[in-house]
Amino acid sequence: MLRTFRIGGIHPPENKLSAGKKITALATPKQVIIPLSQHIGAPAQAVVKKGDLVKVGTLLAKAGGFVSANIHSSVSGKVNKIDNALDASGYKRPAIYIDVEGDEWEETIDRSETLVKECTLSSKEIVDKIAASGIVGLGGATFPTQVKLMPPPGNKAEIVIINAVECEPYLTSDHSLMLEKGEQILVGVTILMKAVNVNKAVIGIENNKPDAIAHLQKLAVNYKGIEIMPLKVQYPQGGEKQLIDAVIRRQVKSGALPISAGAVVQKVGTAYAVYEAVQKNKPLFERVVTITGKAVANPSNFLVRMGTPISCLIEAAGGLPENTGKIIGGGPMMGKALISAEVPVCKGSSGVLLLTTEESVRKPIRDCIRCAKCVGVCPMGLNPTLLMNATEFQNWELAEKNYITDCIECGSCSYTCPANRPLLDQIRLGKGKVMGIIRSRKS
């Protein structure tokens, strides 16, 4: 019997319209806008200035703190300016504008397709290389990878878990990456294992991707300590705590990190980025992004340079449909509506979803009928309707007492609510407020 996590969960329609589409390199735009905040933590600090010439892979900004990440140029050209620019958050924040001239790469980057299996670096050297290359988690959280590979005192890694679930509807970037870059991913996993000194890794893949499972299982025979584990389809299995529960049957306590359960969790795309950084000296400046939607002419998986406007993906997929109601950065469950198609692709951009006008209309909100469906599907075992009420009445003490900060913002509660209550929207606001109160209490 296939495993899955044991608390809550839903089964939204998959709508994997771009499944089976080969990864295609998207043409480089005339100008890229590269935000200095593409990760959780402190913004990176620019080390270039207006007029500087850069190459593909040139360091543009250094990590601004322990929890931060370097940022590299995705193009060759001239720095036009450093100014505020609109990003996926909806805010204007510092970014580097680069006018593209040619496609000259840093000489240290190995651009060959030759597979490099053996890693001769020590654990510390691997972590340092990952940090220097600006690698972050390529899911939505974009947590700097090197920090995850340095467990706090008193914690020891026992296993590396690779999140290849891709449970978010519509998105297929990870699926396509597994089919086309399977061997490189496995080498990346062995590097991650070496970085945290463990001899066991599990790649969790939902069983709606049988081709990826079969492909990686065939390749993994030649890689000691790596298991490919098919999982029962259930959303949000890609959540760290849910995946740990599914794979090793351990539950991470409230407020604790995955390492407390002995697990280091990384996205499959991150494993590939680690391979490229450590074995090919290639910083993280491009990634696979899905562009999709029921009205999209050609749903696709594109290899996109960071800083490329979303509009370029839309044009390459057949243009903006006339009946487009919303542009979503990410998927329909955890993604957020973008206020402009000129928002640039960043390290955390897994997909772009175009919803039709009909799909974008919110249903009328009605009174809660106390059915408790939201409680039953919450993968964190929370009471969403109570947390929404606490937020509406600004009862922050009640919200904190009922673990609002444990919410992973998966949207399962809103999805299942028969009264169409904006549970996630309100909980998100309340969570942000409570986290601010907790931070001020500690300072």
Where is each model-derived feature located?
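Conserved hydrophobic positions within beta-strands
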Residues: 77-79
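Ferredoxin-type iron-sulfur electron-transfer modules in oxidoreductases and energy-metabolism complexes
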Residues: 349-365, 375, 379-443
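Histidine-anchored nucleotide/phosphate-binding helix
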Residues: 179-195
